Amino acid sequence: MSRRRDRRMMGRALALARLNHGLTAENPSVGCVILDAEGHIVGDGVTGLGGRPHAEEIALDEAGAAALGGTAYVTLEPCRERSAGGSSCSTRLKEAGIARVVCAITDPHPLAEGGVTALRKAGIRVEIGIGRATAAHLYDGFFRSVHAGKA
């Protein structure tokens, strides 16, 4: 994928994240866009009102089998562990056969931290940093809550 396409798709994911910003309880509003192996958008999602479902879940459910070999653009590191049971987003991405994840910024929350490492251990190519400045601004309040032990 080209850097230009990466920036455009991350911009789309960040726009999705802004839709529910402040409406997702203690969870951050995340945006996710899934491309198939040919580079076509096959799914997208934003964290649901109240914090569930996660953006990756919505996008992967929409993409279905078309996600195989594709790329996921996610505004915040996919969770490594699930607080409410079920599979974590990093596990769901792996099980869907995603080949590459482009993540704007890592997540310091204990349940998410390590999601990138889990994806890489599964053989998924992960790139971090496209859209980082915008994501850092979007998640500033969430990051402060995590560091203060309130999230």
What are the residue ranges of the model-derived segments?
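Generic structural signal for well-ordered alpha-helical scaffold segments
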Residues: L14, R18-H21, L60-G64, F143
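Phosphate/diphosphate-binding glycine-rich loops and adjacent basic-rich segments that engage nucleotide
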Residues: G141-A151
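Zn2+-dependent cytidine deaminase-like catalytic core
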Residues: I34-A136
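Short, basic/aromatic recognition patches
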Residues: R4-A25
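Generic detector of well-ordered alpha-helical segments enriched in charged/polar residues
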Residues: G11, A136-F143
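Acidic, glycine-enriched active-site microenvironments
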Residues: S29-V30
